[in-house]
Amino acid sequence: MAKKLAVVAIGGNSLIKDEKHKTVEDQYEAARETTIHIADMIEAGWDVAIGHGNGPQVGFILRRSEIAAKTEGMHEIPLDVCGADSQGAIGYALQQTLQNELYRRGIKKPVATVVTQVLVDKNDPAFKKPSKPIGSFMDQVEAKRREKEMAWSVVEDAGRGWRRVVASPLPKEVVELEAVKTLIDAGAVVITVGGGGIPVIDLKDHQYQGVAAVIDKDFASSLLARLIKADLFLISTAVEKVAINFGKPDQKWLDKMTLAEAKQYLAEGSHFAKGSMAPKIEAIIWYLENGGKQALITNPENIGRALKGETGTWIVP
């Protein structure tokens, strides 16, 4: 049987079950539960590349950095390095829990994490309008000082204080693509484009430099799925299926959507929440418009059933 290749995108929030379960140990346990379902895919004959979010985790790293700088005079950690730190830590949790589960099932398959840079265009319009809040809240005095001394973009956030905002540019290329392909071809499960990848710009002739930005992890996974010619782009999220008219009396759960329907529902503007489902639908549209084969949205515990066509929302060209 010919192997089928899937890119599975996992949310950074899915490693944090609730407000009371945020520790590293809690996140490891959440990773273990998620990788059981990925092991089911592998046992069913899929090759898998895994992308993941890192929003809360980068927030924790930044907070530690800010506290250490304020209380001990330690140097602060740049945002691109925070991204690299989170790729290593989350990759380690996913890698080890998946390795353990595969070994328990008698499946011999290596698992590897690739610290991944993703190229963005230094002229992307997003750099002119930073909009992604990161880090802790500050008072106005501190915010304005950092704006002046460190060239930060800062905004007042809903009356709760001031925060730094950074750009969220579109991913253009996966710098480590050939390494990722080589590992997949050798039969490995690859954890890559973590947190959307570390955003880098090309100064000249493939001389890369990290930038303070955040790439949407679903868009980075969408790009990866396209570049490695995956048979499936699967977004693992908090809901079993996608709904239109979400939260309204005429709410309807969808088993299947065509690309045209997905674009129509998105354009109508009332179906998908801006910060949660809308970017996932946008990433899938981007994938299918550029030659992608099929996409699936479901929650981790239903991945096995969804692949059998029993649940989840399938999006097709």
Regions found by a protein language model. Give the residues of each.
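C-terminal catalytic "cap/lid" subdomain
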Residues: 2-317
